[in-house]
Amino acid sequence: RKAWHILNRMENVGGDLNAYTNKEETVVYSAFLTEHLERALELLGDIVFHSTFPQHEIEKETEVIIDEIQSYEDNPSELIFDDFEDMIFRNHPLGRNILGKPELLRSFRTEDVLSFTRRYYQPGNMVFFVQGQYDFKKIIRLAEKYLSDIPAAEVNNHRVPPPLYVPEHLTIAKDTHQAHVMIGSRGYNAYDDKRTALYLLNNVLGGPGMNSKLNVALRERRGLVYNVESNLTSYTDTGAFCIYFGTDVEDMDTCLKLTYKELKRMRDTKMTSSQLAAAKKQLIGQIGVASDNFENNALGMAKTYLH
């Protein structure tokens, strides 16, 4: 079947069929009405395990991705995140940006893509996750019908650990109105017991709440930035912590001083029991609201099962 035929089969019943990649997973997913479960599973199985990747389709999609790369490179507030991970994971796969380079994309042939999918798209390397009002026995029956012909093979997902972290400072000159700044370091991996505590501290420091310490210090009190945030990313074997803000060039040094001041205060000042309780309450509330989104909920649980 042509790609359009597959997409149209889902669109015709108001469903959504999509995919995305990050640095450790590829996700193919669908959202649909309960009555279209079998149609969705049949299409997903066909896409993941039976795609043929004709060369003309690869070449067409390559140009789409190159357009995306060019658009991305025009946005320094996004590009800086890739530059940051390239620095802290220097000469390591985690330091490479997900979209890749145009010259590499144009070199791909059908057999390259098929070889990759045969190697990694294996039952032992995947999870199949369904969320909704379904009978479990029906799910098993349909999975056996559409997914049972997949040959199993041993998959080695081991990668070389990132090299020892060496602090760096990088300045990239660009003709923009704003200075885009990122400060960060390595963080905890997804299995580290200290990760949850760091997520809580990160939320207090520069999480999505308007009352985060950095947002109050840089935006609410002084109006120096439009956006300031801190982020913690946990991979299976390492992690990354970063603070980002965009500001006028003349305000950059002031913002840096204020940021370091908040970091020092957080390091040196113990949270009171009431502050800790409030921080936990806020994070629990944010998790609860995010869980109301079925897509976030399903993808989050599937990732938990995978790792």
Residue ranges of model-derived segments:
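Phosphate-proximal small/polar/acidic motifs at interfaces that engage nucleotide phosphates
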Residues: 215
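Short glycine/proline-enriched turns and hinge-like loops at secondary-structure junctions
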Residues: 194-196
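Active-site SXXK
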Residues: 1
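Flexible, small-/acidic-enriched active-site or ligand-binding loops
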Residues: 167-168
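Charge-rich, well-structured scaffold segments of protease-associated domains
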Residues: 5-161, 171-172, 176, 181, ...
